[in-house]
C-alpha cells in the first residue's frame, strides 16, 4: 500500500456519514435516491460522500438498466484497513 492510498482511505473513513454509507452498502447495494432517503440527506450531499468513498476504493458503482432508464447502483467493496508504527515506517522507507 502506498502513502497516498492510506491517506485517501483514512480521510474517507474519518467522516461518520461515510462510515454509515459503507454500513448500508455492505447490507445491500443501493442507488443514490435510496441512500439519500435512508440517510435523510440531499442527493448532492450523498453524491459528494460517495465520490470520496470511490476515490478511496471503498465503494464501486455499476450502471444498470431498469426499463428504459439507467440507474447507478453503488456497493461496498471488500477492504481491510490496519495501520501501526511498522506500516508507517515502511510507507516512508519505500518512497
Swiss-Prot record:
A molecular function GO annotation: DNA binding
Keyword Signal: no
SMART domains according to UniProt: HTH_ARSR
Keyword annotations from UniProtKB, A to Z: DNA-binding, Transcription, Transcription regulation
Annotated InterPro entries: ArsR-like_HTH, HTH_ArsR_DNA-bd_dom, WH-like_DNA-bd_sf, WH_DNA-bd_sf
Record-given protein name: Uncharacterized HTH-type transcriptional regulator MJ0229
Native species: Methanocaldococcus jannaschii (strain ATCC 43067 / DSM 2661 / JAL-1 / JCM 10045 / NBRC 100440) (Methanococcus jannaschii)
Amino acid at each position: 500500500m502506498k502513502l497516498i492510498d492510506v491517506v485517501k482511505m483514512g480521510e474517507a473513513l474519518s467522516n461518520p456519514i461515510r462510515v454509515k454509507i459503507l454500513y448500508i452498502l455492505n447490507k445491500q447495494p443501493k442507488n443514490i435516491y435510496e441512500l439519500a432517503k435512508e440517510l435523510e440527506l440531499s442527493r448532492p450531499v450523498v453524491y459528494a460522500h460517495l465520490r470520496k468513498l470511490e476515490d478511496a476504493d471503498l465503494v464501486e458503482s455499476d450502471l444498470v438498466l431498469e426499463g428504459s432508464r439507467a440507474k447507478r447502483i453503488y456497493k461496498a467493496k471488500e477492504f481491510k484497513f490496519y495501520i501501526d508504527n511498522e506500516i508507517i515506517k515502511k510507507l516512508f522507507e519505500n518512497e
